[in-house]
């Protein structure tokens, strides 16, 4: 009776209380995933005409909506044209965000964007305020469709002589959207099921086109806006400068590390010529930025290659983009904080600007949560599935950072491990901080008192 009364009291308090933007975003992604799951379980979605079981459909719908790319089976051989179309819609919704698509309909209907919608837009685009959010949303829509269209046109023209116009058009559209949204899904299974882009590892047009789409999609919408204004580097915001510097540094370092550890590995880069090694080393660095396309066998990577891949996957792309992971600026803030503390400084600075303590704490919170979740997931997968710890960690980080690369272990995961990967993909796309603040924390209020401080032994 007491439990029932407490529930009724909580329910009455919630009546009439509007949902926060964080809860709206998290709930909307969950609804989209469930709708996608229902569509994928229909017999018409399967290439064989048989109904797909619920768990694999849920796994695939979550992977598509959360723009990850992990899947228990080959996309082309499992899904019909209808099923692939459902996946494409889920990828677009998940990559651009449901608010972008909703805003498109608002613009088409010539309706006004209300305050609540602006708040949700700002949260979805990782903005600190609502100023200029509608204009930025227009830029996101126009820029995204334009870039995807250019990528689709290039790929269609390139594939046309080899596959015919209709198939080339579908390949161009699907892979352009998948690459730009950093999803990693491919429909090249008619060439070799489950091979991803390995059949194109000697094709610079395909790899460089998809790589460019991945990089642009992972920069973030705020960065696009500043780049479109053609400002000099010094006049750009600190955020944009950090994103550009971090992206360039991560791409170059990932390229160098991949070539270093895989150069003589005959199962990956070792059997290629100089040009092939450099091309595939660069594409591996790009795809680790949460893209999920594989031009080399990820399961054949050396232990050093897998360890480096885990680190780069964990960092991910930039905030307000189609990519996942810790985010580039979060990683940079952590490095700047470490550098400041090692020098005995109490403030964190970048480009002669001080970073607020709250944002430093947010970065530390996200990083700590991601690392702990990654290691817990690896241990859980090892305990429930016949997978080595390195491959389990690779799989857990790939899901949590919405990368989509796999060392060949996705198909051998147990049911509990698959459920964990589904949760990790969802957490990775919505954001650990968004979920914690939206659902786990109570109403934000001023602290009425603090306990007395105490000193501990640290280090």
Model regions: which residues?
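Membrane-proximal intracellular helices of multi-pass ion channels
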Residues: 1-459
């Amino acid at each position: 009776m007491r439990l029932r009364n407490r529930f009724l009291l909580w329910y009455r308090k919630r009546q009439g209380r509007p949902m926060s933007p964080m809860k709206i975003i998290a709930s909307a992604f969950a609804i989209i995933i469930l709708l996608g799951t229902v569509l994928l379980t229909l017999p018409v979605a399967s290439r064989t005409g048989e109904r797909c079981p619920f768990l694999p459909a849920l796994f695939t719908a979550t992977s598509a909506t959360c723009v990850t790319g992990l899947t228990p089976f080959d996309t082309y051989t499992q899904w019909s044209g209808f099923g692939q179309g459902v996946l494409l819609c889920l990828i677009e919704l998940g990559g651009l965000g449901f608010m972008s698509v909703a805003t498109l309909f608002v613009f088409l209907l010539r309706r006004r964007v209300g305050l609540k919608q602006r708040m949700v837009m700002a949260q979805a685009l990782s903005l600190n305020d609502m100023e200029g959010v509608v204009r930025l949303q227009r830029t996101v829509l126009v820029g995204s469709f334009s870039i995807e269209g250019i990528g689709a046109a290039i790929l269609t023209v390139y594939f046309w002589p080899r596959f015919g116009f209709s198939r080339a058009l579908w390949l161009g559209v699907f892979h352009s959207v998948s690459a730009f949204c950093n999803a990693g899904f491919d429909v090249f299974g008619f060439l070799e099921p489950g091979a991803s882009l390995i059949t194109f590892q000697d094709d610079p047009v395909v790899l460089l086109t998809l790589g460019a789409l991945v990089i642009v999609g992972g920069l973030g919408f705020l960065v696009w806006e500043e780049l479109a204004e053609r400002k000099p580097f010094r006049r750009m915001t600190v955020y944009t400068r950090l994103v550009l510097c971090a992206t360039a540094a991560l791409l170059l370092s990932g390229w160098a590390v991949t070539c270093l550890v895989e150069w003589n590995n005959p199962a990956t880069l070792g059997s290629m010529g100089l040009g092939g090694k450099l091309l595939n080393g660069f594409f591996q660095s790009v795809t680790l930025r949460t893209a999920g396309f594989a031009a080399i066998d990820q399961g054949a990577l050396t232990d050093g290659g897998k360890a480096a891949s885990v680190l780069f996957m964990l960092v991910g792309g930039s905030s307000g983009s189609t990519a996942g992971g810790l985010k580039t600026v979060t990683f940079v803030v952590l490095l700047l904080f470490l550098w400041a503390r090692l020098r005995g400084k109490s403030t964190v600075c970048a480009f002669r600007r001080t970073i607020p303590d709250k944002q430093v704490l947010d970065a530390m919170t996200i990083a700590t949560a991601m690392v702990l979740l990654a290691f817990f997931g690896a241990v859980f997968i090892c305990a429930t599935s016949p997978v080595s710890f390195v491959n389990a960690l690779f799989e857990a980080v790939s899901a949590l950072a919405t990368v989509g690369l796999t060392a060949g272990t996705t198909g051998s995961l147990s049911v509990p491990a698959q459920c964990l990967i589904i949760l990790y993909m969802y957490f990775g796309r919505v954001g650990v901080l968004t979920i914690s603040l939206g659902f786990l924390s109570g109403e934000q209020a001023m602290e009425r008192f603090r306990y007395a401080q105490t000193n501990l032994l640290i280090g």
